[in-house]
Amino acid sequence: MGNADLRTLAAIEPKPFDELGGSVVAVDAHNWLYRYLTTTVKFTRSEAYTTADGEEVANLIGVVQGLPKFFEHDVTPVFVFDGGVSDLKADEVEKRRDQRERYEAQLEAAKERDETDAAEIAALESRTQRLTDTIVETTRELLARLDVPVVEAPAEGEAQAAHMARRGDADYVGSEDYDALLLGAPYTLRGLTSNGDPECMDFEATLSTHDLSWEGLVDAAILMGTDFNEGLSGVGPKTAVKLIHEHGDLRSVLAARDDDIPHADRIRELFLDPAVTDDYDYDTDIDPDFERAREFVTETWGVPADEVERGFERIEESVIQTGLDRWT
């Protein structure tokens, strides 16, 4: 999820949705789904997001509840899904899996205690959330029935989204992860799953504010710590930038301090030259099949109609109002 300390360095300004009309947002699909599953949909009634067979379907509620915000402001989302993971990312995934298993044990223990309050259980449930194959595949299918554009990344969806934005094929990246800055995303919208307006991280303004190159920003982040490495002891955002200014780059900093960060060059490459593709194509003129979408959510997966009907109505109304339905 990236190092939250990057926020200290990021140039961030509020971005009202009303100013986003006509834009295309390349959304990190896994990040967007995870936020909905852990912060939004989890607080609906429990039977609404789990089938009788125990399959989680909260993602379907999240898609239906989350899309109207885009369409009501004439914003086209393009959902970018993760592909494979690097060896270093696989190590991080394994660490998160181990941590999640510990939280799952705590959750089971909490449920067995009569005095455990609902807030504690909700917090533990959010920490044990995982994106299962079923969640990812049913999300793809629902987006397809709603004719919402999808791009398949060869590796990290966020890296692919940043690449698309740098090529001019998207106006913004949509992600809660501060690593979007390190991937060179020109403009990143955070808070797309919240009730209010999002905020926008500006890549070039961030570099200018701290007198850093893209490489320098990545080097500073590695010194602070990333998903792929522990940072140097006592090195926070201000110190990291100062060290890069004093020594020029990551290698020189490490040499001057007689220190080491394992796989530092590979980590740099993951941010500066990630696996991405130009082999994608999508149409922003959408043509939703609402009947098939409703059928998929409420009949195929058994989501209570009252949980999603207003969302479907808002999508349908907004598609008409914003002129996205070229077929009318």
Curated annotation (Swiss-Prot):
The keyword Ligase does not apply. Binds 2 magnesium ions per subunit. They probably participate in the reaction catalyzed by the enzyme. May bind an additional third magnesium ion after substrate binding. Its cofactor is Mg(2+). Its EC number is 3.1.-.-. Residues 120-248 are annotated as: I-domain. It comes from the Archaea. Disulfide bonds: none annotated. GO terms for biological process: DNA repair; DNA replication, removal of RNA primer. Residues 320-328 are annotated as: Interaction with PCNA. Residues 1-100 are annotated as: N-domain. Keywords: DNA damage, DNA repair, DNA replication, Endonuclease, Exonuclease, Hydrolase, Magnesium, Metal-binding, Nuclease. One of its GO terms (molecular function) is DNA binding. Mg(2+) 1 binds at D28, D82, E156, E158. InterPro entries: 5-3_exonuclease_C_sf, Flap_endonuc, Flap_endonuc_arc, HhH2, PIN-like_dom_sf, XPG-I_dom, XPG/Rad2, XPG_CS. SMART domains: HhH2 (SM00279), XPGI (SM00484), XPGN (SM00485). Mg(2+) 2 binds at D177, D179, D227. Interacts with PCNA. PCNA stimulates the nuclease activity without altering cleavage specificity. Structure-specific nuclease with 5'-flap endonuclease and 5'-3' exonuclease activities involved in DNA replication and repair. During DNA replication, cleaves the 5'-overhanging flap structure that is generated by displacement synthesis when DNA polymerase encounters the 5'-end of a downstream Okazaki fragment. Binds the unpaired 3'-DNA end and kinks the DNA to facilitate 5' cleavage specificity. Cleaves one nucleotide into the double-stranded DNA from the junction in flap DNA, leaving a nick for ligation. Also involved in the base excision repair (BER) pathway. Belongs to the XPG/RAD2 endonuclease family. FEN1 subfamily. PANTHER family: FLAP ENDONUCLEASE 1, FLAP ENDONUCLEASE FAMILY MEMBER. This is Flap endonuclease 1. It comes from Natronomonas pharaonis (strain ATCC 35678 / DSM 2160 / CIP 103997 / JCM 8858 / NBRC 14720 / NCIMB 2260 / Gabara).
